Amino acid sequence: MGALLVISLFTISALAVAQNDLPVARKDQDTKQAYAAAEAGIADYFFHLSQDNAYWGKCTGVPAPTAVNQAWNGVGADTRTNSRLIAGSSAWYTIELLPANGATSCSAGNAQNTMIDANTGTFRIRATGHSRTAKRSIVATFKRKNFLDYLYFTDYETADPTWYTLDTNGHATRSGTSPTWTGPDYVTWGSQNCPVYWRQGRGNLGYTGQIFQGSPASWQTFVDNCTEIQFAPNDKINGPFHTNDEILVCGTPTFGRNAQDRVEVSGPGWRGNGGCSGNSPNFVGTWTPNAPLLTLPPTDNSLSTVAGSSYRFTGRTTIVLNGANMTVTNATMGLNNVSMALPANGVIWVANGSCGQGYNPLDPYNAPQGCADVYVQGSYGSDLTIGSEKDIIVNGNLTKSGDTMLGLIANNFVRVYHPETHNDANDATNCTNQAGVMTNVSIDAAILSLQHSFTVDNYYCGTPLGTLTVNGVIGQKFRGPVGRGNGQSVINGYTKNYNYDDRMRFRSPPHFLDPIQAAWRISRYTEQIPPR
């Protein structure tokens, strides 16, 4: 209501200026009032779109009062029957939905194909303002700018410092000077120092301290740095790409599917791995260095106020999706394979109870029951967003049924389930896959890790697991590993097969954009001459 009031006051003010612009001719005054009315029409539509990201898809079936009409071709009687009068003025405006892709009108049953330009992901409206006999038209183009524009998004192209415990095999580290050793351990040092961009000097950072290991165990010199992750020769990013950092390249990885896929880095460019030969990335998409930063919010806790009371859970939760229903297990809440319909508003929220710890990469499945670890698998038949105050663990294929969308948003990690058996307490990488481990996993989802990474548990263990296919988007604070390679061969974990879901350019899972406050914006604003 406040925003609408501002719009009304702005419009009245603009009209007042026009009305007091004396001694101009009556025609000139009316022309100015007509333009101000057209601006008010654009502001009116933008206000409603800001309140409801799906407003455009309702075509003319929006709540009254409304000035929204199907497009009029200018021939015959004017079909724009919906209009709004400017408060305190005789000026008024109409709004038209300008169809795309050769369509003649916006169809609520097929809004995607009739309103959204297939090449740009944008849509257009026309507002025409009238004052007496004068009229003027403005065409506005709307587009989203957020991480859903990209198949792949990272804030930092360095490994999550949580994984640094793997470099120490879980052994204690210390730094500082003897005998007090008041400096941080290696993992803490990484968390404090490595979340900076490469252009800010991350490559010059180093940790010097001691590690307690050996037989018999003793304190020994330990030196390490921030862990960089490269794009390998066979890596393919099948969609638009953005990192706030810059990329490390080994060989000739491929970025983008065509020139319409932007390949953006906020740094000055890319750098080659000195241990690889022929470093030359294949930019099929449009290479764009020095791109503006995109900022992730710190949490997704706002989803807790959106989810209905029956769809707010606490502690470890297992969800198996099955079409329009789901089966839920949650010991904290006394639920054991309880069948439920998917939520009407499409939002599920899982909060921490009594937790007290984060992700332990060397022992990922022993977190307290009160931790918001959400295990999810299955096939979903309606749009859905699952949010977690801690982690989301995909423990089976996650696939869509029909034209549906799934969002997975975790404050911490989004993980792929991979249990293993450790064979040597002193070597974390000496481990094997457990029986029945998942191979060739498929995930149809928009994935967002706000504070950490999308990763595979125990990615460094066992024989290769086939292909990890993600159809959607992947957004993460730190680069998350899903396997290990030797040259062009995968030796542990998964081979990546990441593909952009082009629907994400103009659609989103329910309330998925709320945590990052992404919305439609006006990307172009031009007057149409002659007016319609």
Regions found by a protein language model. Give the residues of each.
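OB-fold and OB-like beta-barrel modules that bind single-stranded nucleic acids
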Residues: 34, 38, 127-129, 241, ...
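N-terminal segment of the canonical double-stranded RNA-binding domain
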Residues: 1-7, 513, 521
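N-terminal periplasmic/intermembrane-space "pro-region" immediately following the signal or transit peptide
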Residues: 54, 62, 75, 91, ...
